Amino acid sequence: PEAAQPALSGINLEIQPGEFVLICGASGCGKSTLLRQCKPALSQHGEKSGAIYFNGKAIEELSFREQSEKIGFVMQDPEMQIVTDKVRHELAFGLESLGTDNRKMRVRIAEMASFFGIRDWFDSPVSALSGGQKQLLCLAAVTVMQPQLLLLDEPTSQLDPIAAGEFFNTLKRINSELGTTVIITEHRLENLFPMVDRVVFMRSGSIVSNCSPADAAEKLRGDDEFFSVLPSSVRI
């Protein structure tokens, strides 16, 4: 709040329903700050200017219920997000908080358990899960709310490469099969790059490039910071 320079500056970004968008950049570039502005309940304090609209409505005007139902958020550390001790309780927590009908809740939970392939550990304690399973549980617990927009802040930062790849594949299924709009910040680009529709590169709180993965190499060829982190298949 007392920083001399704004955390974000000159941001102009429009995302269409059903898009899969990757936001990347060095630590401190503002990507996580930007992501959190899309869910007011999680946005940072401080002076703000500009406006964000969700389905034509100023995002600050969304009720807590609308935010909870329509905008999902997955954090870096699953331990900071999981609130119950059992897998099935975690899947039910959000729906119970909104007073969802019991029958509807059971149907949704069963569908998500099947979709995410977690039926084998549905009755397990959360403490028995691996890091990858815990993050998958966080994703499932958010998706069971049937959000229109899914925000993910470096969700694979604590996962090994195999678990990260599986997580990305599940995320792509959510986007393509459920039609959910996905915005993700990530530092692992190799597997994720071919899956997304658009890549947004940020530096010092501003967007420096906003393009398709196919155009990224050409647009960033003279930018050593970003060109060097592109997947090798794109740089060729």
Residue ranges and their predicted role:
Residues 103-121:
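Conserved ABC ATPase "signature" region
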Residues 125-129, 133:
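Conserved ABC ATPase signature
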Residues 47-57:
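Conserved ABC transporter NBD signature motif
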Residues 150-153:
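Catalytic Walker B motif of ABC-type/P-loop ATPase nucleotide-binding domains
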